[in-house]
Amino acid sequence: MWRLKIAEGGNDPYLYSTNNFVGRQTWEFDSEYGTPEAIKEVEEARQIFYKNRFQVKPCGDLLWRFQFLREKNFKQTIPQVKVGDGEEVTYEAASTTLKRSVNLLTALQADDGHWPAEIAGPQFFLPPLVFCLYITGHLNVVFNVHHREEILRSIYYHQNEDGGWGLHIEGHSTMFCTALNYICLRMLGVGPDEGDDNACPRARKWILDHGSVTHIPSWGKTWLSILGLFDWSGSNPMPPEFWILPTFMPMYPAKMWCYCRMVYMPMSYLYGKRFVGPITPLIKQLREELFSEPFEEIKWKKVRHLCAPEDLYYPHPLIQDLMWDSLYLFTEPLLTRWPFNNLIRQKALQVTMDHIHYEDENSRYITIGCVEKVLCMLACWVEDPNGVCYKKHLARVPDYIWIAEDGLKMQSFGSQQWDCGFAVQALLASNMSLDEIGPALKKGHFFIKESQVKDNPSGDFKSMHRHISKGSWTFSDQDHGWQVSDCTAEGLKCCLILSTMPPEIVGEKMDPERLYDSVNVLLSLQSENGGLSAWEPAGAQAWLELLNPTEFFADIVIEHEYVECTGASIQALVLFKKMYPGHRKKEIENFIAKAAKYLEDTQYPNGSWYGNWGVCFTYGTWFALGGLAAAGKTYANCAAMRKGVEFLLKSQKEDGGWGESYVSCPKKDFVPLEGPSNLTQTAWALMGLIYARQMERDPTPLHQAAKLLINSQLENGDFPQQEITGVFMKNCMLHYPMYRTIYPLWAIAEYRTHVPLRLS
């Protein structure tokens, strides 16, 4: 039976940590673990998911929850409450629902203080890991028979009815993910005419019906070239010389968004090497299965710009195709011939590899995310198949593996700090006695303090295109090392609030100098327009987005400002200013004023704000209203607050909640959800209205939303898993299963505190 292990590093000599692996999550299969009842519970969860897989596509992330609740002998002892038709929500009903949620949330906390959770959803994360291990010969070493069973389960369970796979689990089928998952099935031993529900024949038919893999997007062309299923001449150039450009060039790496930089860094190394994996009998078979014409007869030069319409979200502008053509026709032939291949190309490859090693070391071989992880790992193997760097990469593969009732997934990377910050704030908002929530707050406080990044990247980090990180929080854990502004804001808020509480109950408060370091990071990430970027200062020329080489993402070339990062940072710095009024007072006041102005300036005409990391306008509006309220803006003195409230009230559904389709994100236009409300989005909207003091004008919409949340609570105190609610880069969704547990609790807590309720 599968078992989640927390904060363990084992005795692997290739594994090291900055904080004794606090926050690390790894799964192992233990044949001795689990009673017959526990095994039956897991199998029933799998069957229920499979039966309903086309109705609710995100999993409930139940395996670790079953494990934790079983190990803690959790029993929900408080009876469920329902508010009947025509009845008012009473203080007692809200309190009972809240306490039941808190009981469950505290039981789900790990011993190191964080709340484990899946963070997956995209269907192009896992296949490249399988490809890499297949090439290096470690597929059977890393993935045993139990892993393989779960990988196949995940692929089968998320195959669309038309035979393809979407960019993410709720998306329409795409060439990119259908081809990648088909190849993955074949590498795991599934025959071309095999697979559950004829998975392989159906997928192959979809691929061939849509033009064959010659129409795969550029990232797919790269992976197929690496595998020997494409010729490198069928891909647009990715010259490693990019890494030795002079600083005045518009495309200088330091001006790029960090994820764009980190993906194309190992890609350019592999491209520059023209690396191709071993041409095995399986690769030769796949050459016959995936194309509509003989492999040897394909005119590779003509397929470079092909992309299936199902994959095309960002069509390349003409100027970009002209740039690729120039590089392809003139630059590459020059750089790959003597003497330039020795004078320039070899130097560029070495500089690129130096950057890869630097990033690997500074993230403890986790890297910035899963797409980059696999590419960097493969680059290290290509450089030295028996080298220490590749072995260190292998040791961190388990950090990315997640298992739920719908099988094995590759995480984007962990969301430990992100989820923990919100869970702690939800518990604090509950206003329950410290006897009840004190132990959970103490553990959460410990995790947050342990997870703060204590140092900047090593050495001359600016020459390696890195920004300060000392004092920040990452999205996952301290070992990851990458600062994020909103994660830093949420961590700072938690530490500030907990510092006002008895240390014997919630733990010792954080040293003020470490709080000052956090403030320094936030101040450094504000742009001239007042907005906050996420990872590094924004400021590169906007026209560089015309060179976005991906077809299925938008706004990936340069760093941008984000509503959520801005709103969260205002809240954190307003709180900090109250508690430390003498520290950088003028800078912080200017920061808050500029940030509030940015929120006012970026409001949509309908009163909403676009959410970059959650679905979508509901999410962005929650953060914006929270930031504006913290900055002193009110419904009476701020038109943006009034318009934001109007947007939320107009979009409230008949059942009292809110529901927004993920399609809002790529369309950049509010698209209501068909059917019932989404409870996570309802919680966001409810809290947004409370920030704007809606209860002082007309509390009815708040009562309606709270009633829906209360009546939707499950027997164990949780809330049902519904539609996917996370997003990145406009077009790809992320599944955050802890959201359904945290946000309804938090919203009910704020509702009970701020909205006058009748006593029964």
UniProtKB/Swiss-Prot annotation:
Pfam families: SQHop_cyclase_C, SQHop_cyclase_N
InterPro entries named in the record: SQ_cyclase_C, SQ_cyclase_N, Squalene_cyclase, Terpenoid_cyclase/PrenylTrfase
CDD domains: SQCY_1 (cd02892)
Active-site residues (renumbered): D486 (proton donor)
PFTB repeats by residue range: 98-140, 148-189, 441-485, 515-556, 592-632, 641-683, 702-743
GO biological process: saponin biosynthetic process; triterpenoid biosynthetic process
Organ and tissue specificity: Highly expressed in flowers and flower buds, to a lower extent in young leaves, and present in old leaves, stems and roots.
GO cellular component: lipid droplet
Chemical reaction(s) catalysed: (S)-2,3-epoxysqualene = beta-amyrin
A GO molecular function held by the record: beta-amyrin synthase activity
Stored SUPFAM superfamilies: Terpenoid cyclases/Protein prenyltransferases
E.C. number: 5.4.99.39
Gene3D superfamilies named among the record's database cross-references: 1.50.10.20
Alphabetically ordered keywords of this record: Isomerase, Repeat
Family to which this protein belongs: Belongs to the terpene cyclase/mutase family.
Function field: Component of the oleanane-type triterpene saponins (e.g. saponarioside A and saponarioside B) biosynthetic pathway, leading to the production of natural products with detergent properties used as traditional sources of soap. Oxidosqualene cyclase mediating the conversion of oxidosqualene to beta-amyrin, generating five rings and eight asymmetric centers in a single transformation.
Protein name: Beta-amyrin synthase 1
Lineage: Eukaryota, Viridiplantae, Streptophyta, Embryophyta, Tracheophyta
